[in-house]
Amino acid sequence: MQVYGLNHWGDSFLSCNLHRIEHYIKPYLGNVAVKDLTTHDLDLFYDSLQDKPTVVLKGHKKTDACVSRSVIEKTHALLRSALNQAVIWEYIPINPALRVTLPKYQPQERTVWSASEAQQALDSCTDPVLKLCMLLALGCSMRVGEILGLTWDCVDISEDAICAGTAHVRITKELKRCQKDSLAALERRGRSTVLLTFPEWKQTGSSTSLVLKAPKTESSVRKVFLPKTVALALAEEKGRQQEIKELLAGGYQDFDLVVAHEDGRPYEERQVAFLLRKLTDATGLPPVVFHSLRHCSASLKLQIGGGNIKAVQGDTGHAQSRMVTDLYAHTNNEERRRLAEKVETDFFQKRADTPQEKPLDNAAEQAYRLLRENPDIARLIIATLQKQA
């Protein structure tokens, strides 16, 4: 961990892996020497984890559930990586994690709104903060942390830009709540990506800090052009914030945030998630997590843009185009129904409307062949028919 993890992992991945080591690996395998660890040991370990109580990160809602198969798979990935490193360092000759049998895991498909459901959500939303967040997610394919970390100095919504269709946002940072110990460890290694640490407004001590930090990957730093509706909503919010600043004067805590409380303090992901739950409860729309709006946005852009994957990838900030097609090309039943109708009209009905040459029966075929091979007989038959007429 000290040699590899702190030199390669970001704060979130580091925190999650430290949590898995502390609560899932050390209690059950901590007394086993690496050289003595076998594939059978790991098989038994993963099987037993299914009956162990899950341990949630600090600040997360407690649960009575047992360790999920998703967590087991991630724990295995961590162990496999660590044991690969042990092979490289020549502590062991082979990696015992390579041939383990994991409990079967079927990833749960995330619910994603259709275009009509997303439009209904926007039309029904009366909370200005949630509506602005939804517009940025659907219009710009932004992650929730990128939306909450967006600052006005990265927004171009001048009248000229809106008229010319060049209004845009520059995504250069994200807002995130991180474990203090992970942040401190990365800081000591000179790998901190924190740009700003927000004050702690709660009096009680916390193990986490709310920060503005650089995005997770280089490709996440990007420029996204704004649909006019989104640009106008941002302009309206900027005017509203200016009025509040003048009203509160020194009482406004100005962090230059686009999405902010009435006194300037930042919103957090859990607060936006709560607002979204209230909206789905009130409207009867399918309950979704906020990140699924980004899925919805990417799918809409793929459809509207005729499958222009590179353009969509530029908006989503994914490092690889495969991630856009694999994760975000969400196809719903209505689209599949329309596709079936199009196959019917463009293929089967056209085939039915095309005149088909009827096959000849055996007697007719023999007569036809006889006339072709004996043109004199054919002329005689024609002359006879003409006389009868």
Where are the regions that the model predicts?
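Catalytic-site neighborhood detector that most strongly recognizes the C-terminal catalytic loop/helix
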Residues: K104, V112, C163, K173-R177, ...
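Proline-centered turn/helix-capping motifs that create local helix->coil transitions or kinks
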Residues: V87-P96, D156-C163, R177-L183, L234-A249
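N-terminal DNA-binding module of tyrosine recombinases/phage integrases
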Residues: M1-D43, E237, Q241-D254, N333, ...
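C-terminal catalytic core of tyrosine-transesterase DNA break-rejoin enzymes
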Residues: S70, I88, L135, G139, ...
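C-terminal secondary-structure termini that scaffold catalytic or DNA-interacting sites
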Residues: I157-H168, K173-V221, V230, D263, ...
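Active-site/catalytic core of tyrosine-dependent DNA strand-transfer enzymes
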Residues: S68, L195-V211, P215-L285
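N-terminal core-binding DNA-recognition domain of tyrosine site-specific recombinases/integrases
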Residues: Q2-W89, P107, R265-Q271, P286-S292, ...
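Basic, Lys/Arg- and aromatic-enriched nucleic-acid-binding interface segment
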Residues: V55-K58, T63-R69, E73-T75, I88, ...
